[in-house]
């Protein structure tokens, strides 16, 4: 039903120097439809998830990440 959690060591990277321009890292937290993955799948803590969500939304507004992927 759900794909396996990412559970990578990206939590430390989120705390330090993650930026809305780091699209390659932020794309790990977005599914194939362009939706932001929930905490139960990413394995991030609450503050980290809020920061990632905020950065993804900033990247979408800056046109670095798409709002919707593959809508036909």
From Swiss-Prot:
Subcellular localization is given as: Plastid, Chloroplast
GO terms (molecular function) for this protein are: small ribosomal subunit rRNA binding; structural constituent of ribosome
Q: Name one GO cellular component term.
A: chloroplast
SUPFAM superfamilies recorded for this chain? Ribosomal protein S18
Query: Which species?
Result: Emiliania huxleyi
* Complex and partners: Part of the 30S ribosomal subunit.
PROSITE patterns per the UniProt record, alphabetical = RIBOSOMAL_S18
Family to which the UniProt record says this protein belongs: Belongs to the bacterial ribosomal protein bS18 family.
Extract the InterPro entries matched here: Ribosomal_bS18 (IPR001648), Ribosomal_bS18_CS (IPR018275), Ribosomal_bS18_sf (IPR036870)
UniProt-listed PANTHER family: 30S RIBOSOMAL PROTEIN S18 (PTHR13479), SMALL RIBOSOMAL SUBUNIT PROTEIN BS18M (PTHR13479:SF40)
What protein name applies here? Small ribosomal subunit protein bS18c
Does the entry feature the keyword S-adenosyl-L-methionine, yes or no? no
The UniProt keyword set, sorted, is: Chloroplast, Plastid, Ribonucleoprotein, Ribosomal protein, RNA-binding, rRNA-binding
Leader sequence range is none
* Gene Ontology terms: biological process: translation
UniProt entry tagged with the keyword Transferase: no
């Amino acid at each position: 039903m759900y794909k396996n959690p990412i559970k990578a060591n990206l939590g430390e990277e989120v705390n330090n120097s993650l930026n809305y321009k780091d699209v390659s890292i932020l794309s790990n937290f977005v599914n194939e439809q362009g939706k932001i993955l929930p905490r139960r799948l990413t394995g991030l803590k609450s503050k980290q998830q809020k920061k990632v969500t905020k950065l993804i939304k900033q990247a979408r507004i800056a046109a670095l990440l798409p709002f919707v992927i593959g809508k036909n």
